[in-house]
């Protein structure tokens, strides 16, 4: 049986001070402020770009494109949040992610609660 110190060690602390279980996230622990903060500091393409381009900016650009095309508010929101799990998990490039089904499972859990 795990002691309390081991259980607490399995949580990540967010920008706002929330404790989030990175394997079994709970909706009440997810805050838009934490998502926005983290994504604004995460670079797209694992940093393999000529200049810093944040995941947050990518999501905003996707949402702007959806608005320009006349898509519904629901689609615009989906564009804003499509990479939200990356605020809690490191992004993996698709060619690697396909070899890590457990990672995909955990990412799907985050997307479900977000």
Task: Put a short name on every predicted segment.
Residues 1-114:
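Metal-dependent phosphohydrolase cores
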